[in-house]
């Protein structure tokens, strides 16, 4: 495997007789390339070669284990083509590092897994729910986008779909955003499927444990693989179902080249394997809805009466019944009276209250108190934050430097104000507002998975909300402007997903559950939350993006790097070329906020972003042109001068 793009192709080698039996397709080998030994995989064995020069000899077979199966090789090729990457980069994600001792362990022959009977009543609440389970039992390639009801035990539904597929003799792959979701799904899955037939793959595993579980999938002893984003490449044969939960979560986007999204890889794999697919969530992304609109997948959505019965009552500022004369601070206060009243009512009934804040920490962002300029680090221009009430100074969130004497670089003032209030500061404020009430914080490294019964105030960041026995009595969604006000393509979609994930933990309206969102009720995203209509929101979002030419209605390639290198790549790729590829060239623009600079570029070198936009039908052609251009640049540059452009196809954050 060669890391330079212009050498991303197959090479022919002669196989010595002593290695002939072991050198089978898919095994790891060592070969000599330009005088040095490099790792590689055997792709196929042939009796002839198209190479007209002298062939070298294979040096040795590292292991006779065929780790690169035909199915995974096809997937690797397709992902590299889709995301304008190299196969070496994709293989790094797909095949873990070898652990020799684990390979030598004897694996018992896989038997028929024990699967408990599946109760279809959970899926019966949804239109086409029973039909989807029946299709899995018949090993049909049913594809669905499932809208989970509020309060739904999503892991139980996923486990039922997996068990139905395993019972039919097929394997299942389930992808979740993080370890917390993985643990939840593991408990639900092992309640229905024999634990010895289920493996979990995640980044937190050590190399030995990860390779052992990966081999269990390769050798056929694992029939159900659940894992985080990289598990989407798990080497399962006879694949019958691919599932993805909460595809709106940024954790499913791979931060390493070629930056594939687990949802896209999973759907690509389902297409190649001609198997069933399921995307589930409390909210819905425009990408998932596009699959429904195209006819590739079916809607699995509960009828409106069922949604109203299961959802909490959602109120916004204009729904409080207070006019501006009675509550002048309702539109400006961080905790208006409507939110405080909902919290007090729930606490008095003995129920816990969930308070969702967008950011962890104490005060994660500061600004000048006079001119409102954002306070930034003098060393790296990163955002400054306060770590606590007694903090000796502001700390940079990027480089960690401490600035003990804050002074605005624009107006010279030494007065600062909080731009965003974090979870710990919010917990302090609530402790003063509700004396004698337990305040629990779940954010960052301090995660609380489950609450005990009884009243409590729980301050949590999105994704860190603990489950409460019987559900929360109320939820307060604070600082809505921090989510909705972002200059980002997915700001509204992301806000609704975070809100619905929290609101789904609240009791139904019939049991007194109420959700208070501190935002104007006239905002379309807030209206979607009030009506609990994620499908309608996704429909509107998709229509709006289609109208202005944004993903998923089109494909966009983001090229990040120094201006000269970006221009050189465009010239090498011959883009744009009206005669060959109808591509719109947009930019240059600055990198979006929060997007890190490409690796290897000096800190003082300016970085730009150029965007290339094509219709969906020309996405593969755009990626192929960029791959050719990257290869040309790679061949021209030396190791000392190499500064390739970072290329991302359909990045989450466009700018």
Curated annotation (Swiss-Prot):
Pfam families: PriA_3primeBD (PF17764). One of its GO terms (molecular function) is ATP binding. Initiates the restart of stalled replication forks, which reloads the replicative helicase on sites other than the origin of replication. Recognizes and binds to abandoned replication forks and remodels them to uncover a helicase loading site. Promotes assembly of the primosome at these replication forks. GO terms for biological process: DNA recombination; DNA replication; DNA replication initiation; DNA replication, synthesis of primer; double-strand break repair. It comes from Mycobacterium tuberculosis (strain ATCC 25618 / H37Rv). Belongs to the helicase family. PriA subfamily. Keywords: ATP-binding, DNA replication, DNA-binding, Metal-binding, Nucleotide-binding, Primosome, Zinc. Zn(2+) 1 binds at residues 368, 371, 408, 411. Binds 2 zinc ions per subunit. Zn(2+) 2 binds at residues 377, 380, 396, 399. Its cofactor is Zn(2+). Component of the replication restart primosome. InterPro entries: P-loop_NTPase (IPR027417), PriA (IPR005259), PriA_3primeBD (IPR041222), PriA_3primeBD_sf (IPR042115), PriA_helicase (IPR050880). The gene is priA. One of its GO terms (cellular component) is primosome complex. This is Probable replication restart protein PriA. HAMAP family: PriA.
